[in-house]
Amino acid sequence: MNRRDVLRIGLAAPIAAAGFAQRGRATTPRPTIMTVAGPITPDALGPMLTHEHVLVDFAPLAERTAEPTTARYDPDEVFDVVLPHLQALRPHGCRAMAEFTPAYLGRDPALLRRLSAASGLHLLTNTGFYGARNDQHLPPFVFTETADALAARWVREWTDGIDGTGIRPGFIKIGVDGGPLSDVDRKLVRAAARTHRRTGLTIAAHTGPAVPAFEQLEVLAEEGISASAWIWTHAQNEHDPAHHVAAARRGAWVAFDGVAPASLERHVALVRTMKDHDLLDRVLLSQDAGWYHVGEPGGGDIRPFTFFFTDFLPALRAAGLTEADLTQLTVTNPARAFTVQVRTR
């Protein structure tokens, strides 16, 4: 993306904190997106990568203590390794990133706040629990507590901040396995729905195939929550585009978030299909890149974030997407998806 592209996509939006109308008259909350540095207005977000990672710790839960923990890694080292990758995004026009590492997998809001300040990027963190990978990253209490009790934990992070940092989540991150929803997966979805109703935070669900995706939509419907409050994460792992179209028509956000050199052509085709069905307004895009791997020397092989801008956006242009389409996908849709707003049926 060259300088002309940067200006065209509208990257000069000022950073503004969300607030309220003057006292003495009816107060209406401004639309808000919650970053690790505090609230901003949606028009301040700018072009966004909607699903990336700064670090992850896949060690078994028994080897780690309660979140956040720096016992297994040096935050200063992670900062030094990751910061150049974030700084490399700014010349390409990127201004924001949703960081998807959940609790009990290395979520570190304080580190993200440092990286945000140093890089100039808006970073979002999350609340919620990750039930994918056969539940191995769920703390034991998840299996015994009710959905309401889990929701209360997540709501507390919204009202009080995460683990004493004062940093509030910008979305709800849950994970489910790739088959029909298990009992604990279903509980996580209900807890997320109830958290959304009390906070307005959007639900991003690590999902993949269509079967658990549509089962989640049914749970949300039972809870009275609109599909527009839910992001189908890793939707590219469902190979029948008809399911993407069906979910988008129900109002869900469909996230094609595995953009990489090996998957570029597939992601272009998926986006083109959604354009052909006039559904680009329900699509989110990202790479699932980065990944300082705790336990590997120097964090292992960090995948740069810039491929999205250097290769993927030009490939979308070559496939017939217009500049208005790209603005929709990189600016308008992310701002709408991550705006804090209760969305009921």
Regions found by a protein language model. Name each.
Residues 51, 97, 196, 254, ...:
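Divalent metal-coordination and catalytic microenvironments
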Residues 7-22, 31-38, 306-345:
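Mid-to-C-terminal alpha-helical segments outside catalytic/metal-binding sites
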